[in-house]
Regions:
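Short alpha-helical segments used as structural interaction elements across diverse proteins
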Residues: 1-2, 23
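N-terminal Sec-pathway targeting helices
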Residues: 2-16
Length: 355
């Protein structure tokens, strides 16, 4: 009996020793692991945070530069008669609309945002359908005169306008090396001052009409478009020629290179949008062949950039609403490259040529 009792005691002692050994080993390993933790763990955590912050800054830097800030856009009606060439300020715009007017001519509406442009023009009179695009850009609207329909619509639509007929220097002035009515000039600075004096808001939270891309858009599925010819009428056509080095298009009108009045540099653009919409003679009792633009609805078009073109749809639901430009194949809103854009609105029958 005594021997069994001793065996039991020794068994318990052995078990206790084994457990103590296991526990001691665990404590030793935990201590050693703690001692082996690198002293720069905190530094690594800080480095990760710095990388994340840099990535965030990089994302900010990728935001488009052409349309930013809360400066309210200023839309200026620009004369496009050959007697007005060369025009001033077009290379400083973020957006230009070119649309038919009477006599087969076109007129331009140039939009500036946060730009200090000393000479802009020649400024010409308003046509009512340009107001649709001033409204969708939430722009202050500058012009020199107006058609009867434009005058009526400016009033009824509550357009914040600046009419050169009612202003002298320094807001508008005439230059001596062009003949009237192709010689009225202005500047963004004097227009902004006049707008403030009239109590117009000069800041805007409105988003861009165009969906600017953060990364360069390459239309890999598009057709070749290194030269694009757009006939607006029997009288007027424009051609854009692509420069693969600058990745921009140079503008020609009626076969003539278009240059800037102030700098002599060629007029260029990063993006071109073509929209096909019919026009017809406006029955306004004047017999002056003034036009009406049928631009409410969904229309075919093209988006052109970096030497390629894709088919798009252009949808405008009302005069005030933004035009939505979508890929004709996918239905998705197109991404437009960071840079200025010319929107050419021409008749549905126009035969645009690509080379």
């Amino acid at each position: 009996m005594k021997s069994k009792k001793y065996l039991l005691i020794w068994g318990i002692i052995i078990v206790i020793l084994i457990l103590a050994g296991i526990l001691g080993t665990k404590i030793y390993l935990d201590k050693r692991n703690a001692e082996n933790i690198p002293s720069n763990v905190g530094e690594e955590t800080n480095t990760i945070q710095q990388i994340e912050e840099l990535n965030k800054e990089e994302e900010k830097e990728k935001e488009p530069d052409i349309f930013h800030g809360d400066d309210r856009p200023i839309a200026v009606m620009i004369d496009n008669h050959s007697g007005a060439w060369p025009q001033a300020g077009l290379n400083k715009t973020y957006l230009v609309y070119e649309i038919i007017v009477e006599g087969g001519e076109t007129r331009l509406m140039a939009l500036f945002k946060g730009q200090d442009v000393a000479t802009v023009g020649p400024v010409r009179s308003s046509r009512h359908y340009f107001l649709d695009y001033a409204m969708e850009n939430d722009a202050i609207y500058a012009h020199y005169g107006w058609s009867p329909k434009a005058k009526s619509d400016i009033s009824s639509l509550g357009i914040n306008n600046l009419n050169g007929i009612y202003y002298g220097k320094p807001t508008f002035w005439r230059i001596s090396d062009k003949r009237a009515p192709h010689n009225a000039m202005t500047s963004t600075k004097t227009l902004l001052a006049a707008a403030k004096k009239k109590g117009y808001k000069t800041t805007s939270k409105a988003t861009s009409v165009l969906n600017y891309a953060k990364e360069e858009v390459e239309l890999s599925e598009g057709k070749k478009a290194t030269e694009v010819k757009i006939p607006h009428s029997y009288l007027h056509s424009v051609t854009y020629k692509y420069d693969s080095k600058t990745k921009r298009y140079t503008r020609y009108a009626r076969g003539r290179l278009q240059t800037d009045y102030s700098t002599g540099k060629s007029i260029t653009t990063k993006n071109i949008i073509i929209m096909f919409a019919n026009n017809s003679q406006l029955q306004d009792g004047t017999s002056k062949d003034r036009q009406n633009l049928h631009n409410i609805g969904t229309f075919d078009g093209y988006y052109i950039t970096n030497g390629k073109a894709i088919k798009i749809k252009c949808k405008k639901e009302s005069r005030r609403s933004k035009t939505i430009y979508t890929n004709a194949s996918t239905g998705e809103v197109i991404e437009v490259n960071d840079g200025n854009t010319w929107i050419n609105i021409c008749p549905k029958s126009a035969k645009v040529k690509f080379e």
